Amino acid sequence: MTFPRAALSDLIGDFIVYRGLEPADQRLGGWSEFAARRGLPARSIPRKSEEAYAEVALAILAQAQSLRGCHGPLAQLLYLGDTRLLDGQAFLHMQERSGWPGYAFLASENLQAPAQSDREGSLWLANRWAILADFVAANPGNERTVVVVDLDKTTMGARGRNDRPLDNARAE
């Protein structure tokens, strides 16, 4: 089966926020604007697991929701990632700061074990990305639901499946 070439923007538009917390869509403010308003050094970009990261990310999400012209502010958070520690912490900080209900789906492929998922509160931990379909079915959203997708290498090389060649290429 052959698929045509596509870009991430075909799936999610320009509402992409880069690692430095700067959105692709220039209508959205990012870290540099946030830091300037607070008198913080622009070079001190918070890490994903820090509360300040969640604060900036939530501000960007609120701006994006406003640009979409939806009725009402965001009210639910769904998060997709591949690491229990970093993505799980980022989600929990975002959920705590926003007060929104939500769930995170965190998958790390392990093809040697039978497919399974476990729940730890609002975290779904899975060893197969295929289990994502169950997560989506159990957590329907609406126009006030934001879905945060940690794209790092997850979209190109799922942890435990195709991540080694990407790690090797980064090291070269």
Feature locations, PLM:
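HAD-like aspartate-dependent phosphatase fold
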Residues: 1-172
